[in-house]
Amino acid sequence: LLASSAASDVYKRQIPDKHKRISELIQRKYNLKIKKYTSGRKIAKDYGQKIFELMNEAYSPLYGYSPLTQRQIDQYVKMYLPILDLRMVTLITDANDELVCVGISMPSLAEALQKSNGRLLPLGWFYLLKALFMKRRAKMLDLLLVAVKPEYQNKGVNALLFSDLIPVYQKLGFIFAESNPELELNGKVQAQWDYFETQQHKRRRAFIKEIK
């Protein structure tokens, strides 16, 4: 089993033309809407549960994924949604306001953790807050979560998602984006990077031995 992470540039001034055309076409064809929030409490109330339910629905077919329990979902909604910069969170809904796609990203905390040697005290908390909320951020962002409802996969919904997010990344001064580990054989997620300059710079292998 092979999983890899990819880094992509997001500094270009314009979204690729083909990418933009696909996103506009998909939005009209399926009557999709982009939803943005400015309140963590509001997004948690409206879509907190649905975000992680969609994650379970989209990821369950993938090798090694264990669906989140209701207790875990409740904890993530309470702990993580309030600390996100909601400019970097995009929801896509259908005509009935049902969630069909979500993208969640945040500034990379790697540099902050390096400065504090992985410790929260005495100053580790400051570096983390600086990375998350202050104007001078890291140049790298982490693509934490992209989930698409199964019946909308392979239809270009990802293009609509990133057409909304990329201008935000540029405005905030990010240069690179890094994905979470992706299965090499997951063609759906690999295909979404076809329109970007990417570099695979990490690789993980899992070896399985049958025990008799």
Predicted regions located by residue number:
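Conserved acetyl-CoA-binding loop of GNAT-fold acetyltransferases
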Residues: 4-5, 192-203
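A conserved beta-strand-loop-helix scaffold within acyl/acetyltransferase catalytic domains
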Residues: 37-147
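Conserved beta-strand-loop-alpha-helix junction that forms the acyl-donor binding cleft
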Residues: 148-153, 179-189
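C-terminal "cap" of GNAT-fold acetyltransferases
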Residues: 9-26, 197, 204-212
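Conserved N-terminal entry element of GNAT/NAT acetyltransferase domains
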Residues: 18-45
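Single conserved hydrophobic/aromatic residue that forms the stacking wall/gate
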Residues: 1-7, 11
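Conserved GNAT acetyl-CoA-binding A-motif
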Residues: 140-141, 169-182
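Conserved acetyl-CoA-binding loop-helix of GNAT-fold acetyltransferases
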Residues: 140, 144-148, 153-167
